[in-house]
């Protein structure tokens, strides 16, 4: 919750030591729209090629609010000649990639690039790449633009029935809430730690689930009747 004071907001819950109000600004005044390419999934590879290409399907399903290029598996442009011919903008740390098309209201989900370390990275099919024109703390934009507070603005702006999309002009007219850079840094770090904790518990859950499934299969396989018993007999 936050109290409105003209064009500023004062959050009721925040990190200790911060008292300045949060400013409200138009997205189009803060972020510059870059050029993407339209390469299909068939032109990408999981291992071949040197230029990375961020596909909208991965933004929607695979990537979190922050895309760490050193850790994430990002597809590459398979044909180096095609990669060399790209006229779209090369991405850098802090750029935000938004999925502008989806089959549901997930349209607008984004990821913020980090740890690109000079690698050639492009924004691919059905994406909307943006670059901050001013200083923003790492991780803040990715987490904020994925928040329900911001995403609720996009719902009435979405177009289509079977395939839903949002335009650049509509995105540019949305309103962002912008704290000081120091407070952004605290917010980004907090959600990064939270994401890491969630991932850790998901890994633990998957490990326990796999172990339980293995135990169940062993028990079923030990029975003389049924498909598992027959399978065990065949494997012997």
Positions of the model-derived regions?
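A short beta-sheet element
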Residues: 55-59, 72-146
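Histone-fold recognition with a strong bias for associated Lys/Arg-rich disordered tails
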Residues: 7-8, 94, 172-173, 186, ...
């Amino acid at each position: 919750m936050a109290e409105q004071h003209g064009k500023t907001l004062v959050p009721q819950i925040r990190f200790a030591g911060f008292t300045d109000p949060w400013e409200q600004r138009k997205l189009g005044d803060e972020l510059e729209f870059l050029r993407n390419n339209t390469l299909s999934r068939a032109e990408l590879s999981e291992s071949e090629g040197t230029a990375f290409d961020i596909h909208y399907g991965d933004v929607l399903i695979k990537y979190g609010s922050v895309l760490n290029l050193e850790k994430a598996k990002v597809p590459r442009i398979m044909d180096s000649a095609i990669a060399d011919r790209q006229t779209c903008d090369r991405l850098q740390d802090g750029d935000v990639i938004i999925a502008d098309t989806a089959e549901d209201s997930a349209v607008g989900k984004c990821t913020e690039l980090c740890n690109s370390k000079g690698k050639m990275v492009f924004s691919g099919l059905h994406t909307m790449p943006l670059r901050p024109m001013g200083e923003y703390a790492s991780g803040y934009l990715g987490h904020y633009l994925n928040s329900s507070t911001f995403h609720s603005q996009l719902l009435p702006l979405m177009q289509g029935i079977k395939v839903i999309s949002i335009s650049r002009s509509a995105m540019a007219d949305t309103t962002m809430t912008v704290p000081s850079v120091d407070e952004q840094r605290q917010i980004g770090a907090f959600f990064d730690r939270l994401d890491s904790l969630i991932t850790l518990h998901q890994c633990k859950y998957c490990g326990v689930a796999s172990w339980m499934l293995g135990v169940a299969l062993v028990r079923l396989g030990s029975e003389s009747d049924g498909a598992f018993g027959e399978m065990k007999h065949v494997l012997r």
